[in-house]
From Swiss-Prot:
This is Voltage-dependent L-type calcium channel subunit alpha-1S. Residues 71-85, 137-160, 219-279, 302-309, 452-462, 515-523, 582-601, 624-633, 819-830, 886-892, 951-1000, 1022-1038, 1141-1148, 1201-1231, 1290-1311, 1331-1356 are extracellular. Keywords: Calcium, Calcium channel, Calcium transport, Calmodulin-binding, Cell membrane, Disulfide bond, Glycoprotein, Ion channel, Ion transport, Membrane, Metal-binding, Phosphoprotein, Repeat, Transmembrane, Transmembrane helix, Transport, Voltage-gated channel. It comes from Rattus norvegicus (Rat). Residues 280-301, 602-623, 1001-1021, 1312-1330 dip into the membrane without crossing it. Skeletal muscle specific. Residues 1522-1542 are annotated as: Interaction with calmodulin. A motif (Selectivity filter of repeat II) lies at residues 612-615. Disulfide bonds join 226-254, 245-261, 957-968, 1338-1352. Residues 988-1077, 1337-1403 are annotated as: Dihydropyridine binding.
Amino acid sequence: MEPSSPQDEGLRKKQPKKPVPEILPRPPRALFCLTLQNPLRKACISVVEWKPFETIILLTIFANCVALAVYLPMPEDDNNTLNLGLEKLEYFFLIVFSIEAAMKIIAYGFLFHQDAYLRSGWNVLDFIIVFLGVFTAILEQVNIIQTNTAPMSSKGAGLDVKALRAFRVLRPLRLVSGVPSLQVVLNSIFKAMLPLFHIALLVLFMVIIYAIIGLELFKGKMHKTCYFIGTDIVATVENEKPSPCARTGSGRPCTINGSECRGGWPGPNHGITHFDNFGFSMLTVYQCISMEGWTDVLYWVNDAIGNEWPWIYFVTLILLGSFFILNLVLGVLSGEFTKEREKAKSRGTFQKLREKQQLEEDLRGYMSWITQGEVMDVDDLREGKLSLDEGGSDTESLYEIEGLNKIIQFIRHWRQWNRVFRWKCHDLVKSKVFYWLVILIVALNTLSIASEHHNQPLWLTHLQDVANRVLLALFTIEMLMKMYGLGLRQYFMSIFNRFDCFVVCSGILEILLVESGAMTPLGISVLRCIRLLRLFKITKYWTSLSNLVASLLNSIRSIASLLLLLFLFMIIFALLGMQLFGGRYDFEDTEVRRSNFDNFPQALISVFQVLTGEDWNSVMYNGIMAYGGPSYPGVLVCIYFIILFVCGNYILLNVFLAIAVDNLAEAESLTSAQKAKAEERKRRKMSRGLPDKSEEERSTMTKKLEQKPKGEGIPTTAKLKIDEFESNVNEVKDPYPSADFPGDDEEDEPEIPASPRPRPLAELQLKEKAVPIPEASSFFIFSPTNKIRVLCHRIVNATWFTNFILLFILLSSAALAAEDPIRADSMRNQILEYFDYVFTAVFTVEIVLKMTTYGAFLHKGSFCRNYFNILDLLVVAVSLISMGLESSAISVVKILRVLRVLRPLRAINRAKGLKHVVQCVFVAIRTIGNIVLVTTLLQFMFACIGVQLFKGKFYSCNDLSKMTEEECRGYYYIYKDGDPTQIELRPRQWIHNDFHFDNVLSAMMSLFTVSTFEGWPQLLYKAIDSNEEDTGPVYNNRVEMAIFFIIYIILIAFFMMNIFVGFVIVTFQEQGETEYKNCELDKNQRQCVQYALKARPLRCYIPKNPYQYQVWYVVTSSYFEYLMFALIMLNTICLGMQHYNQSEQMNHISDILNVAFTIIFTLEMILKLIAFKPRGYFGDPWNVFDFLIVIGSIIDVILSEIDTLLASSGGLYCLGGGCGNVDPDESARISSAFFRLFRVMRLIKLLSRAEGVRTLLWTFIKSFQALPYVALLIVMLFFIYAVIGMQMFGKIAMVDGTQINRNNNFQTFPQAVLLLFRCATGEAWQEILLACSYGKRCDPESDYAPGEEYACGTNFAYYYFISFYMLCAFLIINLFVAVIMDNFDYLTRDWSILGPHHLDEFKAIWAEYDPEAKGRIKHLDVVTLLRRIQPPLGFGKFCPHRVACKRLVGMNMPLNSDGTVTFNATLFALVRTALKIKTEGNFEQANEELRAIIKKIWKRTSMKLLDQVIPPIGDDEVTVGKFYATFLIQEHFRKFMKRQEEYYGYRPKKDTVQIQAGLRTIEEEAAPEIHRAISGDLTAEEELERAMVEAAMEEGIFRRTGGLFGQVDNFLERTNSLPPVMANQRPLQFAEMEMEELESPVFLEDFPQNPGTHPLARANTNNANANVAYGNSSHRNSPVFSSIRYERELLEEAGRPVTREGPFSQPCSVSGVNSRSHVDKLERQMSQRRMPKGQVPPSPCQLSQEKHPVHEEGKGPRSWSTETSDSESFEERVPRNSAHKCTAPATTMLIQEALVRGGLDSLAADANFVMATGQALADACQMEPEEVEVAATELLKRESPKGGAMPREP
């Protein structure tokens, strides 16, 4: 084989990878010596590409994994025979892998060829693993030899080998390279790495900031605890971990007798959790962010320093860290996932078709699964076409041949009879009745299974047994009937039927086995539960549900590969864990650590536990302790756990969610598409039914139909993104498809969107319209015109009244929160009771007024017809009743008192924004219904299986040696802490676990807690130890039970719960979109347009005072920025270096450094104040932030100085002398530590520097703005639950060692809220639930009845906590996620699509051209401005000049009369062209449509602004587009003429052919398509430019550099010596700009030019008088004309004939002699001006009227000098005789045609414009109009026979 040609290689690269490799073109040589003909290499190639070889290798890898898993790690490096055997086997694997690697290297070459071995990432991984294996083996041998030679050598020599051995665990990764679907999931995860990296930075940043704050605030506070006096024994209560204490202040005092608080304790968690130095501080903070064990840390800090303010630190940490930043991960992953899928989708129509078929197949498969193979057509049956089996037709043909025969006739009769019977049977099976019968049987089956429970009576067991057999028989009959009716082949086509058959057969098998006594009845009874899956049959008649299930099954596919990846990941970490921790989890204390790594199954369970994040921190603490505690080697262990937790919990588990959200959106669109089809059908029927009605009537009917779903409030119809629509609507491949919703044109949009989404709520005005008085009379007395009623109406609808009531609602809520739950008769409660009377009175009056106004409930629009009003009425009624029932039964009053909590809900009716969020939540709950159903079904199924497996098995005795209840009596001894001297006698108790599986309900409860990931390991180990019914546990009795829990967790917790979350997110997103349903702009377009309309230019302050300017120059330079950046980093490092117990010297150094940094930052502030002046300085929020920090730091320095001065008397706080023995460590007063925070805050300044992080922050703040109403709703939820909690659970006594304790209780309102916040983060909420249930001890101060000391708490706790947890976990947190995913979609969006985050750059760069923020710049600055902005918004600096001009033609922004463009108009035009908003079709019409859309969405947009960005029709605006279009046409014509001149060496006068060719060039080249690069050959143009330079030099004339395309720097020259280029730019950029900005390929940048640049500067004046002299009165005052007048005077002075040229006057110059002085002046000027390298003067026939700066007052340093004659350069004109009157028709036609070709129809239609262009054309090329006309006529004549197709230039 010869080496492949480069073409082949190119092709090969393009082709997608196929799983089966085609024969790759192999490198001719491998390893420099082996050619393709070499027999060894041939053999290797054939082996490596032999399919079984791959399989063998995969199997070997698998075997190796098994071997690694079987290995038993032991403490102290002990070994057993199995392990030694495995060590030997290891060599075998090593040899196999080495051979494989060697063969592949020989076959493919090692490194240097394109397809060499090491060029594939997976091969690199393989190679490293094999290499390390071989290396380890060699080292081991060396070690053995060493030990033999030197027997005394230490054991340490083997250590390095052990470390290397750990690399073996990577071998399972090689499976990935064998399984393609895994690579897809991995790829999308890798793709997300970049945005994830930004988030990781943000998280790291947060962790660092919080760690340093923690270090400053809590350093050394955690080292005191209660010791018994005189001993080192820590004093604790039973069940309580030791915790810090405080001698004084509000920390925890030592209450146990004989104990004292003193230091010397290592700290909580054996000294791992503390803030004593930066490292541990970071670990602690990270643990808090993961929301595991954060409350423990908070409680320890509270115990140490009091609970007044530490909660602020922790709650903000959780809110920012966990809820916000970590949810970003989800946003990014789901974005990436969707993007990957979109990519896959857009890979072509074929793919699309395939996918469509796939979806249909899935659905069909699923439907048939449910409908038992509904494939046969009933008509076919009736005609008797059904063949019994394949052979049917053959028999018939046989019968025809052989003639009639008795047997055959019998067979025929029998078959006919059979056919009829089967047909009847088939009909029966398919009938609704049969279906419902089966459903009924399934329901009975479900009942019989669900009724099983522990200790059930015998008769029930007997009944269940009988029922089981009867039902089994019924199911068997059903199965046989189906088989008969449908035929076997048809029956087994449906998956559901196969499944059914399997269940029935297993049931029969079970009965046979049990009857014959071959097995115990339990084992297989799990199969009975699988029957419950039949419940899914219900979905057949429930489309949305069936779609949901179809989408679930669909996503199971994508999830299968993810599960495989997850499993691989777990295996690797489990094996690594065994290598690291195997056999090491044996500690001094007697407690057994269940989550360990001592064998493979256990290691897998531990890894899985860390993945779910439940209690992962305790597993980590054990790991650290196993390696000697919180000292050097031990701490490194946390790296393993953190990597495992991050990769597993954040990345892999979020991919689950991403897949779920993605598939759900699909399911939604399926459902809505079906709905749409149904609508369509209805519509068709209606239009069929109305043949005689007029069109209008019909359309109104359909309109009504369309509005109908709206009334029902179905939220799902918002997304109709189904393939059919895509194919119809977006035929043109539009890269930005607009969110078009076909068929919905209702105009009755609600004023306010029904969504929690922000934008609208922020913008729309929440005006409440007064409801008119209803027609009917109220209370049968007051007629609508009654004076009293009218007065009531006026009062009720007054804003002051609403606000007054709102105020009272707030006050009454506050009163509820202030009540004392324990002492009912306290003074406070009595006062509050009087207030209560007042509130009730006010609310009653309000309701009476409203009822008087609107009537009670008998007619439409009356008071009680509104749900919110009924709520009001209920609340008031409850208050009134409870006042009346003071004396009677306490329980009733108690319930009524609790109901008062609903008062805050009345605010919902008053605040509109809140009302919409609430409605949205309700909509979400309604749509979630289906998912809840599916989840509940699955949960129920698992609960039934759990009952079968574990009923009655969760009992135990506290004396572990006793196994049954009978034995568990009397007393037993216990040794405290394993110390034989401390003996205690305890009574034995037979304990039932709190969560158990004794009946279906408690099983569902237990499983629910498992699905929230709380406390599931405890339950799991209980299940693993479970033994027989009613006996105690046996350690690790049934490890296989873990499978049940793991499957449940994966299916329910990972999958269903995520789908749940996904559903909420999708619903919210849709709700947000509904209100924009008909506005044709998608979300991104809306945001960008909104930005463009609302943005205002920034002021860019440049001082005039030279000294101040120097300071400003320094402060704004990038070097200064970098210096400050470095200083902040240094400051951070210094802060991080502090630690507990540091030396005096260290203290001294850190104080000095602090002072130094404070001084430096103060200096920075002073310099900036000087540079920007206070007004400019405080205009920037970052500066304000800096200012506050500096002030705080100064206070901090002063305080610490005073403190050191007063150190002798005990520091600052002992000035009063009352200090005595205060320990400064314990003071929780906001001491100097508070001011120390300012040191840390400097860090935050770093955020303003990093680009990616800054964008993140920007979006962050945007999503905060989006949350106000959501936040309000959350506050309300917490408030209501907290008050209920205080009423219901406030009396429970606080007992240390239980969950209701000093830190966690319902006794005050703040405590209750904190407890609820803890539940919302899921911290052991199920423990709190149990601690609040009935039978708890009451608080001694509460008023319980005698004998009811243990009657506190209530079983209402179950409903309370579960409802709260569900609301929080599923709705509230998801609101966060939804808002975040909404705002952060830009992170993963294609960056080439313009988004709102790109638009800030425009503001910043505009400010440099418009430092005064006037909002206008010269239109010639626009090109340079846009070339400085990077795409997608600008053109970027590499955009060739002509392309930039062509783009400007397309943008078409309005040009003001003074030649400037406005800020908003420019930005709007940019956004509009970049996002293709209404750019197609008729331009004026598009403009009108866009105006209408803007008016509709942003109702408050001022008309002035709107006219500025989109000029109204009929406003004959000059636009930048027209301007540049003229330019391009002239430019090309000139170019062509120049080429002609070069060619002939002189100027051809009347050669029409040539001129026609020239015009043709114009047509071709003036087209403004953006995507076309510079037309024509670049090299030709360069030559042309060179020729032009030479020509110019010969003539000895230097023309004005620039014109349109050069550097118009002469107008920028200022009196100072700065290079002219930079009139308005930051001096710092000079150096860079000279080269970079001036190097576009052909032309150079144009810099700001003067307003009168172009003949079109005022095209909206009447062009009919274009031939009138410039002196015409209508023009006299325009700046352009003043400039021309000025020029004329100058010319006259110079003694030169006046050229009559002005914007619209014809340039018929009178010939004259050029004065010598002028040439001198030009030459002088030329020598003065440095010409940048490569700059060329423009072409000789440049259109060049002299343009002059107009002096604008107030421009400050920017106004240009009009006095200096230096800044003029003149152009000589070739004499010309006649002034032409107007453009001739042929030229007009030609120009129009050229414009149309270029896509500028709107300009072609503009007669004035065409005329001006014609004039400019003749003018520019110094030709007679007649010459142009002749050429044009000739050209058009030639064109016409060809049908107008203009020939291209040859």
